[in-house]
Amino acid sequence: MESPAFSKPLKDKINPWGPLIIMGILVRAGASVQRDSPHQVFNVTWKITNLMTGQTANATSLLGTMTDTFPKLYFDLCDLVGDNWDDPEPDIGDGCRSPGGRKRTRLYDFYVCPGHTVLTGCGGPREGYCGKWGCETTGQAYWKPSSSWDLISLKRGNTPKGQGPCFDSSVGSGSIQGATPGGRCNPLVLEFTDAGKRASWDAPKTWGLRLYRSTGADPVTLFSLTRQVLNVGPRVPIGPNPVITEQLPPSQPVQIMLPRPPRPPPSGAASMVPGAPPPSQQPGTGDRLLNLVEGAYQALNLTSPDKTQECWLCLVSGPPYYEGVAVLGTYSNHTSAPANCSVTSQHKLTLSEVTGQGLCIGAVPKTHQALCNTTQKTSDGSYYLASPAGTIWACSTGLTPCLSTTVLNLTTDYCVLVELWPKVTYHSPNYVYGQFEKKTKYKREPVSLTLALLLGGLTMGGIAAGVGTGTTALVATKQFEQLQAAIHTDLGALEKSVSALEKSLTSLSEVVLQNRRGLDLLFLKEGGLCAALKEECCFYADHTGVVRDSMAKLRERLNQRQKLFESGQGWFEGLFNRSPWFTTLISTIMGPLIVLLLILLFGPCILNRLVQFVKDRISVVQALVLTQQYHQLKSIDPEEVESRE
């Protein structure tokens, strides 16, 4: 730079202080983020750190996706400087230790150089990465430093009028007009550039800031910008075995075991009691899964009747088959085991997906503390903790309606109070019909609403204020009892599949369990009881209930939509839907037909013009030939002849 203001030698721009020990600060806060979906919401915190002192100058948190969480960050220059600059010329009095120094600092320009991408000759932390002119990429100076590739821009903010000589309102000068907390009167505004919004922020990034002075060395400070990401609504597996993603393909459909009619007692069997009811039969696969969908429909129809006017309820073929919603509730203490602590109500299955925050008991590890709104420690003694109606304890050892404090005190087990909901997804009819018609194009996959999202928290009053039935009425209704009964029946059937393989590895048992569930849904699909939508088995439901023959209902609805679509078309548009080869035929012969039509329209005119042109040329040629056979006679004037005579 040729300007006199930039003519200071490089050695004057370098402060004679030793190297900074900042590697630990640079490494400590970065963490990579694994993105599952571009639409997933995170809790993003941006932190600006003064690397000279290690203090935080700004920490701003907001909720959003990874593509739109780039806010403006407001802080003060003195937050990056501390009490004073590391200045070789302290007699000048710049810095932030005194009101006068803060006021003088406000009068100077500043420039910023990136440390995350250091250009050749720009130096290191000692020079603030500004070892020569041209390294600066942003700042507030009269030459307006800028860059098209740096990640941020840093400018001065608006200083209120009458702010005064930067007095600190927290000390004795608080009564002076214009005093501010900490005497901050050098506001800065940090904005992200387009390059910064596209960059990876998995690790902290560093910049150097220098105060521009026409005489003397330019003081240096260093700061870093870090992004910290926390997942909102964590889905944390509870239990020793996480979800196994690999699933074996189904080999054969599962047969439904129909109940056999009771046989008459054999003659001479005096021990048989006449008129005794036959032993109860467990429901078959079809009945068990249909009861699960029916119970989900009844609970949804009770709480949100507007959503069940016409909808599709789908069972997923892959794990997890159940979801837990952590809730807060009041459990009851019992000195002896209550009736619901029987062996039949205990389940060895663990939940692989739990959302929300609720009541936790026991030694909860740090990996699962995000599920806890309140954590209670068990006291000494032997008693039982029974979960409220409609809830269950999800423990690291399995599902149970009641806890034994003796077991909790002797082991490292922990439990979370949850509502248990089957993994039933809710789809609108337009989405389902569009998938089968393959006409509707979605820019992105619609968010799947599950029963846990629609009804989660109702039993404990989480969203019961908007439900006319109320919390108590919902738990006590027959619809909710029907869903709970279907859940316990299905859990019992799933657990039997695992218990039959207890002698094998637990992971192998879960693989077989997943295969069994896929076979069950395959049987329903092959029987026409449900419609296969991707990896889900969907049942049609309206205000009349769940339709057993869902495939027939799907075909009926698709035919109705096709007729309605055709009735709204004109006769010309309808031609292309009558035959599959009609469109191909038209597109094939349309080109030659258009060319032939153009020839017939403009051909005669072009031909006439061509013939006339040829005739004109021939006439000219004939005239030339005739003129070559004759010569022009010399003209004689009669008066000249008479004069000669």
From Swiss-Prot:
Presence of the UniProt keyword GTP-binding in the record: no
Topological domains annotated Extracellular: 34-585
SUPFAM superfamilies cross-referenced by the UniProt entry: ENV polyprotein, receptor-binding domain, Virus ectodomain
Region (Fusion peptide): 447-467
Any one cellular-component term (Gene Ontology): viral envelope
Name of protein: Envelope glycoprotein
Motif (CX6CC): 530-538
Source species of the chain: Xenotropic MuLV-related virus (isolate VP42)
GO annotation (BP), single: fusion of virus membrane with host plasma membrane
Key words of the record: Cleavage on pair of basic residues, Coiled coil, Disulfide bond, Fusion of virus membrane with host cell membrane, Fusion of virus membrane with host membrane, Glycoprotein, Host cell membrane, Host membrane, Host-virus interaction, Lipoprotein, Membrane, Palmitate, Signal, Transmembrane, Transmembrane helix, Viral attachment to host cell, Viral envelope protein, Viral penetration into host cytoplasm, Virion, Virus entry into host cell
Gene designation per UniProt: env
Cytoplasmic compartment residues: 607-640
Marked site: Cleavage: R444, E445, L624, V625
Free-text description of this protein's post-translational modifications in UniProt: Specific enzymatic cleavages in vivo yield mature proteins. Envelope glycoproteins are synthesized as an inactive precursor that is N-glycosylated and processed likely by host cell furin or by a furin-like protease in the Golgi to yield the mature SU and TM proteins. The cleavage site between SU and TM requires the minimal sequence [KR]-X-[KR]-R. The R-peptide is released from the C-terminus of the cytoplasmic tail of the TM protein upon particle formation as a result of proteolytic cleavage by the viral protease. Cleavage of this peptide is required for TM to become fusogenic. The CXXC motif is highly conserved across a broad range of retroviral envelope proteins. It is thought to participate in the formation of a labile disulfide bond possibly with the CX6CC motif present in the transmembrane protein. Isomerization of the intersubunit disulfide bond to an SU intrachain disulfide bond is thought to occur upon receptor recognition in order to allow membrane fusion.
Entry comment, domain topic: The 17 amino acids long immunosuppressive region is present in many retroviral envelope proteins. Synthetic peptides derived from this relatively conserved sequence inhibit immune function in vitro and in vivo. The YXXL motif is involved in determining the exact site of viral release at the surface of infected mononuclear cells and promotes endocytosis.
Subunit structure, interactors included: The mature envelope protein (Env) consists of a trimer of SU-TM heterodimers attached by a labile interchain disulfide bond. The activated Env consists of SU monomers and TM trimers.
Record bears the keyword Coiled coil: yes
InterPro entries given in the database record: FMuLV_rcpt-bd, TLV/ENV_coat_polyprotein
Start and end residues of each stretch annotated as Disordered: 259-286
